[in-house]
């Protein structure tokens, strides 16, 4: 059997208002658009890079 893919659960903690367009686009790419929303994404280098780009606006809730 194949291993289950690792996932990261994120929560948006900061607003995208008055942020650069690239940071807003990154939040949309992470499936986040409002404070308090959560999304579960695969743990890949691309997703980790996106999280690092907006680390001041999101927090990692859970890593599986």
UniProtKB/Swiss-Prot annotation:
- Database matches in Pfam families: Ribosomal_L30
Give the UniProt keywords, A-Z.
Answer: Ribonucleoprotein, Ribosomal protein
Q: Name one GO cellular component term.
A: cytosolic large ribosomal subunit
Q: Which InterPro entries match?
A: Ribo_uL30_ferredoxin-like_sf, Ribosomal_uL30_bac-type, Ribosomal_uL30_ferredoxin-like
Any GO BP annotation:
translation
Question: Can you provide one Gene Ontology molecular function annotated for this UniProt record?
Answer: structural constituent of ribosome
Query: What family does this belong to?
Result: Belongs to the universal ribosomal protein uL30 family.
Q: Which PANTHER family does the record match to this protein?
A: LARGE RIBOSOMAL SUBUNIT PROTEIN UL30M (PTHR15892:SF2), MITOCHONDRIAL RIBOSOMAL PROTEIN L30 (PTHR15892)
Summarize subunit and interaction data from the UniProt record for this chain. Answer: Part of the 50S ribosomal subunit.
- What name goes with this protein? Large ribosomal subunit protein uL30
Q: Which organism is it from?
A: Bradyrhizobium diazoefficiens (strain JCM 10833 / BCRC 13528 / IAM 13628 / NBRC 14792 / USDA 110)
């Amino acid at each position: 059997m194949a291993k289950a893919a690792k996932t990261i659960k994120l929560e948006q903690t900061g607003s995208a208002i008055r942020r650069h367009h690239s940071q807003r686009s990154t939040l949309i790419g992470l499936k986040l658009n409002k404070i308090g929303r959560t999304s579960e994404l695969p743990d890949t280098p691309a997703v980790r890079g996106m999280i690092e780009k907006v680390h001041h606006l999101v927090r990692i809730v859970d890593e599986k």
